[in-house]
Amino acid sequence: MKKLILLTSKDCHLCNQALKLLNQINLDNFEFVKQDIYSKRLYLDSYWDKIPVLLLEERELTWPFDEHLIESFLKTNIKEI
């Protein structure tokens, strides 16, 4: 099972919107993890100005995104992995 990470931050209203979108999508084929951007220096250095960010393997989807972009991102990455 592939790990899908949502990078978030405390009091991030866009992150809350992203989480609501993800709750509308079937993520049964993924191990979903909500990760604070401050938990790893690499996340903070790379994505501090882009959150929310979805990470799957070595691919990323940065905000803004909607339900259709998320589904496309997941399908594309499943086919390529």
Please place each PLM-identified region on the residue numbering:
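Generic recognition of short, well-ordered alpha-helical segments
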Residues: 17-20, 45-46, 65
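Conserved helix-turn-beta segment immediately C-terminal to the redox Cys motif
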Residues: 19-37
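Structural micro-motif
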Residues: 45-54
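Non-catalytic, surface beta->alpha helical segment in thiol-disulfide oxidoreductase systems
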Residues: 56-81
